[in-house]
Regions:
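Conserved SAM-binding motif I beta-strand of class I
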Residues: 79-84
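Conserved beta-strand signature within the Rossmann-like core of class I S-adenosyl-L-methionine
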Residues: 147-158
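Central antiparallel beta-sheet cores of small beta-barrel/beta-sandwich binding domains
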Residues: 191-289
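S-adenosyl-L-methionine
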Residues: 20-56, 87-120
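Conserved class I S-adenosyl-L-methionine
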Residues: 55-64
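Glycine-rich SAM-binding Motif I of class I
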Residues: 66-70
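Active-site capping/gating segments
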Residues: 156-198
Length: 289
């Protein structure tokens, strides 16, 4: 940590020790936990886990002194946005960005992270208390583009299972939060595929389109086809980013599908034995409840 950031840390410690101004109930409810600076070794691991690239737009929701966004910009050339409710932290982050020479690549916004427009993010960083992390899950899945990466420090986005986890001991953290144990959770936002789809297979595999009903929740996804009197289930249906994979046992043949979701269409390749042919699907509408 350079001398400037040591100075920032000292100022923040004084701010934390000072009496806090009175807050209304609504404002207090949206402060997503006390300010706890992320140790630098964890900053490094979060950026590494997210696979930050120069073309990324990194959002830090509850950005504190801005260290994650500033480091992403300085080290990788990424652009970034920090969202923080506490005014003094926003000002410190802006000073830090200017000092580190990245003020043209990052901005810090004083605002409510639950109301901030996040659709431009390609990466989202979180270090919030569990109830606030859970509260964000519907927004993250509904508003972020498929393929957006999320890294959450210490608390998972329940009930959404992570794509990866990383655990470590960080001695510096024990002095800050009382424990050295650290866990990072990595997620890739899936394409939204819930609804009714018309699946068209090559004639070598099926002579008519099939209607597929897909249900998609943070913790589970499944697909069902009504075919005559039979119910056919999509096997191992997986959506990661814009990629989709599943299997289907149809007329005694196991067909493996791989493809890409593009809004209201899917396209890809179907494989059954030696047969490899293209497949498509088009969105017909929402599920009937």
């Amino acid at each position: 940590m350079n001398s400037f950031l040591r100075c920032v840390a000292a100022v923040l410690a004084l701010c934390a020790a000072a009496p806090a101004p009175a807050q209304g109930a609504e404002e207090k409810d949206n402060i997503a936990g006390p300010y706890v600076p992320t140790p630098w070794v964890i900053v490094d691991e979060m950026l590494k886990l997210a696979g930050i690239r120069g073309e990324d737009v990194v959002y830090d929701l509850g950005s504190g002194d801005g260290r994650l966004v500033i480091t992403a910009a300085k080290r990788f050339g990424a652009r970034g946005v920090g969202v923080e409710l506490q005014t003094e932290l926003v000002e410190l982050a802006r000073i830090g960005a200017k000092h580190e020479g990245v003020a043209d690549r990052v901005k810090f916004v004083q605002g409510d992270l639950f109301e901030t427009d996040i659709k431009d993010a390609s990466v989202v960083m979180l270090y919030l208390l569990p109830r606030f992390v859970t509260r964000l899950v519907p927004r993250l899945r509904a508003e972020l583009r498929p393929g957006t990466r999320i890294v959450s420090h210490d608390y998972p986005l329940a009930p959404w299972p992570p794509d990866k986890e990383l655990s470590m001991d960080v001695a510096e953290k024990e002095m800050i939060s009382g424990t050295s144990w650290t866990r990072l959770y990595y997620y890739v936002v899936p394409a939204r595929v819930q609804g009714v789809w018309e699946l068209t297979l090559p004639r070598a595999l099926a002579d008519a389109p099939l209607v597929v009903q897909i249900t998609q929740e943070p913790h589970a996804i499944g697909g069902l086809i009504h075919h005559g009197n039979a119910e056919l289930f999509l096997r191992d249906l997986t959506v990661q980013g814009e990629g989709v994979r599943f299997g289907l046992l149809y007329r005694t043949r196991l067909i493996a599908f791989e493809g890409t979701v593009g809004g209201k269409t899917m396209t890809g390749e179907a494989r059954a034995g030696s047969v490899r042919e293209p497949w498509t699907a088009r969105y017909l509408g929402p599920l009937q409840r």
